[in-house]
């Protein structure tokens, strides 16, 4: 383990891991062409892990204000303080919108947080997860046990491999819900934002089945969101909706979700029919929900005018 760098020497600055700024020593700065001209910074107390997998650079550091932080290729994936907002919303927005989901697939999600949330639903009998990078799984189990606890559920089956290839091999109509917990559409996750992938998702869902996928920031990526919405409206013949929530350590402080259903029993994503109570005590080892509730579920679909105009313009 190495302490965060606090020296201005050129030699030490050259050895800084990805994302740790040499302009402000001891700070992590998230800089990417996905959000040009801006950066979000966290003070680094200690670097806990640095590694390079077959797919990406992986880093974990202890921050002074957000607990431990998981970083992939210089981009924050989660922090202990605010991971609840993302994990709870991407799981419960789809699963609370359909009655008694039984078979769920998670694409990505190697930290285990989505699994933790899916496991709250007692109707679920099978949870498959396909994560391409085993290092993410191993690092999460080591440094984020409260997140990776999802892997301990006996209903979970972990598949290490490419999510696109996995979906193509899935028999038609297998899943009630598919959750795509991907990183940004660059590098290993790029295919998860393209039309052929969504076609495979639709095929793998039962009639009236639902998908929820990470869908970027309305402040930074409306051009990407516009393409995602257009593709989904062509492919999914049920409901197609965009929702969003706040996550302080994500670029612009917000993140969006694309929610779609296949043709079949109608799905009203905006009004949950399968509510999950934060205080239901359904598991002695499961902590209460920190972020999600039925009110915030419905509110997530209320869009600012500039985003609503673009997204509605893609309606059939």
UniProtKB/Swiss-Prot annotation:
Residue ranges of every copy of the PABS domain listed in the record: 25-262
EC number: 2.5.1.16
Lineage: superkingdom: Eukaryota
PANTHER family: SPERMIDINE SYNTHASE (PTHR11558:SF11), SPERMIDINE/SPERMINE SYNTHASE (PTHR11558)
PROSITE patterns: PABS_1, PABS_2
Keyword Transferase assigned: yes
Record's keyword terms, sorted: Polyamine biosynthesis, Spermidine biosynthesis, Transferase
Family designation: Belongs to the spermidine/spermine synthase family.
One term under GO cellular component: cytosol
Alphabetical list of InterPro entries matching this protein: PABS, PABS_CS, SAM-dependent_MTases_sf, Spermi_synthase, Spermi_synthase_euk, Spermidine_synt_N, Spermidine_synt_N_sf
A GO molecular-function descriptor: spermidine synthase activity
Pathway: Amine and polyamine biosynthesis; spermidine biosynthesis; spermidine from putrescine: step 1/1
Source organism (scientific name): Coffea arabica
Biological-process GO terms, alphabetical: spermidine biosynthetic process
Binding-site residues for S-adenosyl 3-(methylsulfanyl)propylamine, renumbered to this chain: 56, 87, 111, 131, 162-163, 181
Name of the protein in question: Spermidine synthase
Swiss-Prot/TrEMBL catalytic activity: S-adenosyl 3-(methylsulfanyl)propylamine + putrescine = S-methyl-5'-thioadenosine + spermidine + H(+)
Lineage, opening ranks: Eukaryota, Viridiplantae, Streptophyta, Embryophyta, Tracheophyta
Active site: residue positions: 181 (proton acceptor)
């Amino acid at each position: 383990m190495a302490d965060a760098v606090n020296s201005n020497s050129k030699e030490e600055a050259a050895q800084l891991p990805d994302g740790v700024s040499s302009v402000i020593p001891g700070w992590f700065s998230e800089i990417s062409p996905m959000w040009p001209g801006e950066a979000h910074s966290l003070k680094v107390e200690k670097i806990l892990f640095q590694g390079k997998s077959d797919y990406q650079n992986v880093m974990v550091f202890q921050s002074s204000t957000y607990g431990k932080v998981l970083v992939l290729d210089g981009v924050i994936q989660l922090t202990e303080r605010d991971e609840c907002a993302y994990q709870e919303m991407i799981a419960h927005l789809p699963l609370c919108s359909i009655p008694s989901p039984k078979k769920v697939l998670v694409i990505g999600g190697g930290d285990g947080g989505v699994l933790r949330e899916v496991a709250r639903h007692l109707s679920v009998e099978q949870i498959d997860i396909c994560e391409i990078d085993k290092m993410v799984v191993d690092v999460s189990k080591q440094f984020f046990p409260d997140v990776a606890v999802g892997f301990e559920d006996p209903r979970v089956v972990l598949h290490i491999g490419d999510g696109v290839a996995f979906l193509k091999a899935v028999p038609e109509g297998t899943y009630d819900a598919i959750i795509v917990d991907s990183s940004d559409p660059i590098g290993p996750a790029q295919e998860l934002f393209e039309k052929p992938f969504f076609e495979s998702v639709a095929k793998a869902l039962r009639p009236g089945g639902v998908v929820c996928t990470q869908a970027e920031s309305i402040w930074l990526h409306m051009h990407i969101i516009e393409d995602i919405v257009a593709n989904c409206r062509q492919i999914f013949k049920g409901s197609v909706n965009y929702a969003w929530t706040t996550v302080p350590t994500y670029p612009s402080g917000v993140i969006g979700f694309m929610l779609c259903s296949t043709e079949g029993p109608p799905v009203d994503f905006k009004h949950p029919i399968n509510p999950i109570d934060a205080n239901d005590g359904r598991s002695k080892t499961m902590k209460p929900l920190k972020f999600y509730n039925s009110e915030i579920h419905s509110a997530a679909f209320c869009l600012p005018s500039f985003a609503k105009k673009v997204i509605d313009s893609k309606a059939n």
